[in-house]
């Protein structure tokens, strides 16, 4: 029974390996460069920051622990 499980496991790994593309990274790079070439998502240039209520944050001030 253990041998059958082992053989089944090896065959399933082989099948997954056959259907998994080894050049997936290249396809991803093509997708990303195409995305960057097109200029990204439409509407990004129309971005307006949302209003944040509360205390103003000054990045030059040290935080409560005294670290900068």
UniProtKB/Swiss-Prot annotation:
Name the coiled-coil region(s): none
Q: Where in the cell is it found?
A: Secreted
**What broad class describes the main subcellular location of this protein?**
secreted
Q: List the disulfide bonds.
A: none
- Where does the secretion signal sit in this chain? 1-26
Mind telling me which GO cellular component terms the entry cites? extracellular region
> Which positions correspond to the propeptide?
27-38
User: What keywords are annotated for this sequence in UniProt?
Assistant: Cleavage on pair of basic residues, Secreted, Signal
Q: In which tissues is it expressed?
A: Expressed in salivary glands.
Question: What's this chain's function?
Answer: Horsefly salivary gland immunosuppressant protein that likely inhibits the host inflammatory response by regulation of anti- and pro-inflammatory cytokines. When tested on mouse splenocytes in the presence of LPS, it increases the secretion of the proinflammatory cytokine interleukin-10 (IL10) and decreases the secretion of the proinflammatory cytokine interferon-gamma (IFNG) in a dose-dependent manner.
Query: Would you tell me the protein name for this molecule?
Result: Tabimmunregulin 1
Q: Which organism is it from?
A: Tabanus yao
């Amino acid at each position: 029974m253990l041998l059958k499980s082992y053989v089944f496991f090896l065959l399933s790994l082989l099948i997954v390996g056959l259907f998994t593309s080894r050049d997936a990274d290249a396809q991803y790079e093509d997708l990303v460069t195409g995305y960057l070439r097109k200029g990204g998502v439409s509407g990004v240039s129309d971005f307006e920051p949302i209003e944040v209520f509360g205390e103003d944050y000054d990045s030059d001030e040290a935080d409560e622990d005294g670290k900068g």
